[in-house]
Amino acid sequence: MHDKVVSAYMKDTIHTREFSINDYDAAVELWKRVEGLEIAEGDDKESVARFLSRNPGLSRIATDGSVIVGVSLCGHDGRRGHIYHLAVDPRYQGTGLGKRLVQECFSGLRDAGIQRAIILVADDNARGREFWRRCDWEELSGAVAMGKDVVATSPPMTKERRDSTRGER
């Protein structure tokens, strides 16, 4: 019965909207409170602002009054959609808010012509994995997620440096 009461209450008080960079500080505070969610170097304000501008309207915020209680970063590369940092305030978990944010992300991805989405869930995040399974996501087999930092190993190629490497100085 409690879940039904909370869900009915949520429909009247929880509002969702587009994630704005002005929401960044509150979103980070929420990310820190959600078990299993890791904040990485690419989650700084400048990087998130760039992500939001490349993927307008896809990332979502859920508020209860003026308090942010849910966040999802969503984008695509033109072929596949990606959902990053889905987070729901622990007090609101189990109310359907996470699924609601995912559905809104999917709606935006469909509108953009994207047919498939991918998420990464940490191996040790059992609760997160169970959430995604309940949302009908499946683990992909036959692939391993791999990554590498893109760091400058040499100075950027300026016109002067390009010319000097060609012997055209």
Identify the residue ranges that each predicted region occupies.
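A conserved beta-turn-beta hairpin within the catalytic core of GNAT-like acetyltransferases
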Residues: 75-84, 93, 139-143
